[in-house]
């Protein structure tokens, strides 16, 4: 689970949890690989809003108004540290957004670490809404965002 190391322990998923999430009907996940070494570079994944609302976790109140929308909740867009600051997060995010739009979704929703990850979403047109200053007791500020797809 190479990507889990990027996150606070309170936010890390077990392999079983991640497999369950990615096995949800309608989940959309993409991975980026280094073509020369075939090493993983990044991942992005999300599930339909109805599936995200099955959890009773922090931030779910942000999602309630969207329960009947064609919305995808993005759990993660992550680039391994050695590949960060090279524009690859933007490429990965763009591809994931394209796949989600192609599947017929109208909205992307998520909670992203502020300011870095939130800035990536804002660069694609996301609006930052609610702020969560101690997301899952990590001491980190996360912002809820909404991104309308064209």
What role is predicted for each listed range?
Residues 1-45:
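Short amphipathic alpha-helix that is part of the acyltransferase structural core
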Residues 39-76, 84, 135-138:
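Conserved acyl-donor/pantetheine-binding loop and adjacent beta-alpha core of acyl/acetyltransferases
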Residues 75, 80, 113:
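Residue-level recognition of the GNAT/N-acetyltransferase active site
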Residues 79, 85-98:
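Conserved acetyl-CoA-binding loop-helix of GNAT-fold acetyltransferases
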Residues 84, 109-119, 134-137:
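Conserved beta-strand-loop-alpha-helix junction that forms the acyl-donor binding cleft
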Residues 106:
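Short acidic/polar active-site loop segments enriched in Thr and Asp
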Residues 122-131:
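Conserved acetyl-CoA-binding loop of GNAT-fold acetyltransferases
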Residues 133-150:
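C-terminal "cap" of GNAT-fold acetyltransferases
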